[in-house]
Amino acid sequence: YKRQELTGEAYFQVEAEPERPFYVNTPNGLSVYVYGTQFNVTAYEDDNYIETVLEKGKVNVLPPGQKTITLLPGEQLVYDKQTRQVQKNKVDVYGKVAWKDGKLIFRNASLEEIIKRLERHFNVDIEFNNHLGKEYSYRATFRTETLTQILDYLAKSANLKWKILTPEQREDDTFTKTKIIVDLY
């Protein structure tokens, strides 16, 4: 059999090989047994959940210490790493896998969710300060926009200010990751 360890997010397209099964394992013990299929797994260490979304085919998801759960196309399984609870839902699969085509799709997304996805997509650190505790929900699709264009778009719909801090050069001539401060008033 073939086994893939995953921390982060990956989209898999796997041909069926019954004599050589394919498994994806996450650090928290959740495993996905793959038949010929196309699916996405999100397993970031700093998230409190692991998500599997099935686009085509069939997968079996094995949460730690629980029974196997079969996903069919259009289904999502979310495993809560703290409570060990599992939720199976129907989802808009394209919205979940469009990142592989360079698109960011948000449907009723909070600013916190958008910022986390922007950090990962553009490989930056974003410090988000919600000064008044306001909640906003966004619906947007970004295809070719730069990070600054997206932040400008967000700033037009809320009292949001942002600034980019210049990366600092280290002694070994590498640079720190770009940091962005986002303030919501």
Locations of the language-model features?
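Short, small/hydrophobic-biased targeting/export segments
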Residues: 2-83, 87
